[in-house]
Amino acid sequence: MEKRMKELVDKLNQYAKEYYTEDNPSVSDAEYDKLYRELVTLEAEHPELVQADSPTHRVGGLVLDGFEKYQHEYPLYSLQDAFSREELDAFDKRVKSEFPNADYMAELKIDGLSISLTYVDGILQVGATRGDGSVGENITENVKRISDIPLKLDQPLNITVRGECYLPRAEFERINTQRQENGEAEFANPRNAAAGTLRQLDTKVVAERRLATFFYQEASPTERLTQNDVLNEVAELGFSVNPRRIVTSSMDEIWDFIQAVGQDRDHLAYDIDGVVIKVNSLAIQEELGFTVKAPRWAIAYKFPAEEKEAKLLSVDWQVGRTGVVTPTANLTPVQLAGTTVSRATLHNVDYITEKDIRIGDTVIVYKAGDIIPAVLRVVESKRTTQEAMPVPSQCPSCGSGLLHFEDEVALRCINPSCPAQIKEGLIHFASRDAMNISGMGPSVVEKLFKAELVKEVADIYGLNSQDFLQLEGFKEKSAEKLYAAIQASKENSAEKLLYGLGIRHVGAKVSKQLLESFGTIKELASADVQAIAAVDGLGEVIAKSIQRYFAKEEAQVLLKELESYGVNLSYLGQKVADDAILSGKTVVLTGKLEHLKRSEAKAKLEALGAKVTGSVSKKTDLVVAGSDAGSKLEKAQSLGIEVKDEAWLLDL
């Protein structure tokens, strides 16, 4: 049986390599599916024989508790940027002054997320994000769900490779269409979508989102002589490598390559934002070395933002959750960086005045950071109007008078009952970094608000499944799913609630700092300015903003309402004494608990000094196992890690 399972794993992995990496499948989808189903059946019957590189690991279904930090053995450096031919020539001159015969390899700069993969004896052991270059996050379970990443190499190598994880454009469109249908906020661009997917705690979502990769570096020591040799080796090992690259000693040829790539850029199946030029010889790379931040042997040419002319037809003034009124230009449609653009930001009223932008003007539009369409300037030679841009004096949402404070560039509505601010506040409250209510995106909030089912954030917790069935697009299953997401958000640690309240100057990081110090939102609400300002040196601007917010009667009423609905107001990871019983211990929770919710168990462990992580490793000190504990328990036992049950935790 073990022999047959190994045979199936080897065959399926080879077929997957042919399909995803080589684009040359040797078997039909039906044949692959038949073998895959056979393997699934055998693994269910013989779980003790499941192999580490089995393709069934890619399916997902595992929900992670979080991501552990990962110390990179080989640091990941940034690249020096270049924006002109002159800067490339200066780089070439610097290299050739020491190594006159050096040649270069130029390759596409994929607009994705850097990842590092480490293999031990040919088996994938760790997948990690770049992080700050020295410390990233361990995302091993997620990278296993990326179809073109080999779980096992053909050779038993100890190797670390680096690459870029990206979301193909077609997949990006599919996901955003699905999110729109589900009432969820759409991703701004493929890079953001890839980043969000890599940090998903639900591996099933990762598997469903069809991420892809291109690898470009062997970080561990290699016997290869050139960068091009490294890429050939990496490709032979089964990794995806971008075929579009050149090797030359001529900067003229590299510049021609850059121009050709720039022309093709919008027609590629993935996003790129430039071309990377590296000294091809690894020996010369070693001689040139590094600065503090970047290698001296490489440079990244960044494409300039594409610019197009469009006519400014009208301006919409939109109110954000803090009352800032932002102008958005309606334009004649233009093709820009692969998409049709008919709206672009005008930033603020001061920007309009400074650039003297008028209705009817021909303007230059570009994508800031290749993401957000923005108006850059006016083509004055094509101006046909003499009238200045009309600037509103009243809020377009509630009609209240707008203010333009001396120290601000924007108009602001200060009416707390402004419908637009309330709606935007609800969207913010439900967002991922705040209460993370899955399924409550802008379109759902709009429907709830229009149906007068919610007027403030506390109203969210008074909703039930029947309320959602009143809304267009909801069926019983989707209504129950959203209701469950709302109920689950009650158990969030209170820093997410604090951030969700939308207090000016209080972001996600500040919210956590405050709750770590004060423990509960109630304690924070009653604190004086000096006490708040003293927290990690936050200062008086933030402290006064918080005090002003909680001094209002409606804020006090809101806290009471949230508490009455069972929303947690306490920080679930409070600081503990150094001599706490589990101080310094790394603990993993696994299985189903009978008496404690998982969030309660985690909070209790943290209160006793433990660091609670989502995966078992040699660094794990203790595993608390409930019923139906699976692979984590097995791994703990194989590593000789101490295992306790829920009763032990309750007795502490």
Swiss-Prot record:
<keyword id="KW-0862">Zinc</keyword>
<dbReference type="Pfam" id="PF03119">
    <property type="entry name" value="DNA_ligase_ZBD"/>
</dbReference>
<dbReference type="InterPro" id="IPR018239">
    <property type="entry name" value="DNA_ligase_AS"/>
</dbReference>
<dbReference type="InterPro" id="IPR004149">
    <property type="entry name" value="Znf_DNAligase_C4"/>
</dbReference>
<feature type="binding site">
    <location>
        <position position="413"/>
    </location>
    <ligand>
        <name>Zn(2+)</name>
    </ligand>
</feature>
<feature type="binding site">
    <location>
        <position position="398"/>
    </location>
    <ligand>
        <name>Zn(2+)</name>
    </ligand>
</feature>
<dbReference type="Pfam" id="PF01653">
    <property type="entry name" value="DNA_ligase_aden"/>
</dbReference>
<dbReference type="InterPro" id="IPR013840">
    <property type="entry name" value="DNAligase_N"/>
</dbReference>
<dbReference type="InterPro" id="IPR001357">
    <property type="entry name" value="BRCT_dom"/>
</dbReference>
<dbReference type="Pfam" id="PF00533">
    <property type="entry name" value="BRCT"/>
</dbReference>
<feature type="binding site">
    <location>
        <position position="130"/>
    </location>
    <ligand>
        <name>NAD(+)</name>
    </ligand>
</feature>
<comment type="similarity">
    <text>Belongs to the NAD-dependent DNA ligase family. LigA subfamily.</text>
</comment>
<feature type="binding site">
    <location>
        <position position="395"/>
    </location>
    <ligand>
        <name>Zn(2+)</name>
    </ligand>
</feature>
<keyword id="KW-0520">NAD</keyword>
<feature type="domain" description="BRCT">
    <location>
        <begin position="577"/>
        <end position="652"/>
    </location>
</feature>
<dbReference type="Pfam" id="PF14520">
    <property type="entry name" value="HHH_5"/>
</dbReference>
<dbReference type="InterPro" id="IPR004150">
    <property type="entry name" value="NAD_DNA_ligase_OB"/>
</dbReference>
<feature type="binding site">
    <location>
        <position position="278"/>
    </location>
    <ligand>
        <name>NAD(+)</name>
    </ligand>
</feature>
<keyword id="KW-0235">DNA replication</keyword>
<feature type="binding site">
    <location>
        <position position="164"/>
    </location>
    <ligand>
        <name>NAD(+)</name>
    </ligand>
</feature>
<dbReference type="InterPro" id="IPR001679">
    <property type="entry name" value="DNA_ligase"/>
</dbReference>
<dbReference type="GO" id="GO:0003911">
    <property type="term" value="F:DNA ligase (NAD+) activity"/>
</dbReference>
<keyword id="KW-0227">DNA damage</keyword>
<dbReference type="InterPro" id="IPR012340">
    <property type="entry name" value="NA-bd_OB-fold"/>
</dbReference>
<feature type="binding site">
    <location>
        <position position="418"/>
    </location>
    <ligand>
        <name>Zn(2+)</name>
    </ligand>
</feature>
<dbReference type="InterPro" id="IPR041663">
    <property type="entry name" value="DisA/LigA_HHH"/>
</dbReference>
<comment type="function">
    <text>DNA ligase that catalyzes the formation of phosphodiester linkages between 5'-phosphoryl and 3'-hydroxyl groups in double-stranded DNA using NAD as a coenzyme and as the energy source for the reaction. It is essential for DNA replication and repair of damaged DNA.</text>
</comment>
<feature type="binding site">
    <location>
        <position position="107"/>
    </location>
    <ligand>
        <name>NAD(+)</name>
    </ligand>
</feature>
<keyword id="KW-0479">Metal-binding</keyword>
<dbReference type="InterPro" id="IPR033136">
    <property type="entry name" value="DNA_ligase_CS"/>
</dbReference>
<dbReference type="InterPro" id="IPR010994">
    <property type="entry name" value="RuvA_2-like"/>
</dbReference>
<dbReference type="GO" id="GO:0006281">
    <property type="term" value="P:DNA repair"/>
</dbReference>
<protein>
    <recommendedName>
        <fullName>DNA ligase</fullName>
        <ecNumber>6.5.1.2</ecNumber>
    </recommendedName>
</protein>
<keyword id="KW-0464">Manganese</keyword>
<dbReference type="GO" id="GO:0003677">
    <property type="term" value="F:DNA binding"/>
</dbReference>
<dbReference type="InterPro" id="IPR013839">
    <property type="entry name" value="DNAligase_adenylation"/>
</dbReference>
<dbReference type="GO" id="GO:0005829">
    <property type="term" value="C:cytosol"/>
</dbReference>
<feature type="active site" description="N6-AMP-lysine intermediate">
    <location>
        <position position="109"/>
    </location>
</feature>
<dbReference type="InterPro" id="IPR003583">
    <property type="entry name" value="Hlx-hairpin-Hlx_DNA-bd_motif"/>
</dbReference>
<dbReference type="GO" id="GO:0006260">
    <property type="term" value="P:DNA replication"/>
</dbReference>
<dbReference type="Pfam" id="PF03120">
    <property type="entry name" value="DNA_ligase_OB"/>
</dbReference>
<keyword id="KW-0460">Magnesium</keyword>
